[in-house]
Amino acid sequence: MGSLANNIMVVGAVLAALVVGGSCGPPKVPPGPNITTNYNGKWLTARATWYGQPNGAGAPDNGGACGIKNVNLPPYSGMTACGNVPIFKDGKGCGSCYEVRCKEKPECSGNPVTVFITDMNYEPIAPYHFDLSGKAFGSLAKPGLNDKLRHCGIMDVEFRRVRCKYPAGQKIVFHIEKGCNPNYVAVLVKFVADDGDIVLMEIQDKLSAEWKPMKLSWGAIWRMDTAKALKGPFSIRLTSESGKKVIAKDIIPANWRPDAVYTSNVQFY
């Protein structure tokens, strides 16, 4: 009987230790305030990590939580990052641009590089956290020390929001998502200059002069669900975070189809 009691006490102690041990680990750091379009040039502090291939664009499919694909190609060219909550902002931070620089490591160049937010990270390691593509992280290094800097894995950096700049002639592009039909239209927007991100997308079809607000579906994808079928061509009106508006007139043609890409003739300049 005594042996049974001792065994029960031992098991209880082990379970208690497991419970306590399960709560150990790095403390969770609450996110900072959302980053806005206050381009005042002030540098803030953040933690930086990297993911994917050493010289890659991050996500293995060259995409991410914004829904934008082929970020390894120009104009993103692999200079991408996952932003934490106050940077990604539930998708409304998709496409925004930041300068990032590092100084604390001897391998750091101290020169800023510009990255595009195309993905989301959930690691609560700092109020602001950039999980950079391998290429972007290595770009913070002095010439020839890219790999050595990447071996650091995690480091403190400084960052500030900047206006997005694209090559001359680059216009805003719209992608009609797979599975769309006249009652369900989902549109991804990319290559947005200036603020880089969109806070409102509205659609106008051929049957009405009314601008209908679309819902943010996820990432940089906005959708319209309607009982009454929409009829093309469609015009799209975009509102940027700082309140600027542009209209892509009849950007989606009458014979539109899912999984099609349409390049507009407008841009935020």
UniProtKB/Swiss-Prot annotation:
One of its GO terms (cellular component) is membrane. Residues 63-169 form the Expansin-like EG45 domain. InterPro entries: Expan_Lol_pI, Expansin/allergen_DPBB_dom, Expansin_CBD, Expansin_CBD_sf, LolPI, RlpA-like_DPBB, RlpA-like_sf. Gene3D superfamilies: Expansin, cellulose-binding-like domain, RlpA-like domain. Residues 1-24 form the signal peptide. It is a peripheral membrane protein. It comes from the Eukaryota. The keyword Hydrolase does not apply. Disulfide bonds join C66-C94, C97-C164, C102-C108. Keywords: Allergen, Cell wall, Cell wall biogenesis/degradation, Disulfide bond, Glycoprotein, Membrane, Secreted, Signal. It is found in: Secreted, Cell wall; Membrane. Expressed in anthers and pollen. One of its GO terms (biological process) is plant-type cell wall loosening. Coiled coil: none annotated. Residues 183-264 form the Expansin-like CBD domain. Glycans are attached at N34. Belongs to the expansin family. Expansin B subfamily. May aid fertilization by loosening the cell wall of the stigma and style, thereby facilitating penetration of the pollen tube. Acts selectively on grass cell walls, which are relatively poor in pectins and xyloglucans and rich in glucuronoarabinoxylans and (1-3),(1-4)-beta-D-glucans, when compared with cell walls of other angiosperms, including other monocots. This is Expansin-B9. It comes from Zea mays (Maize). The gene is EXPB9.
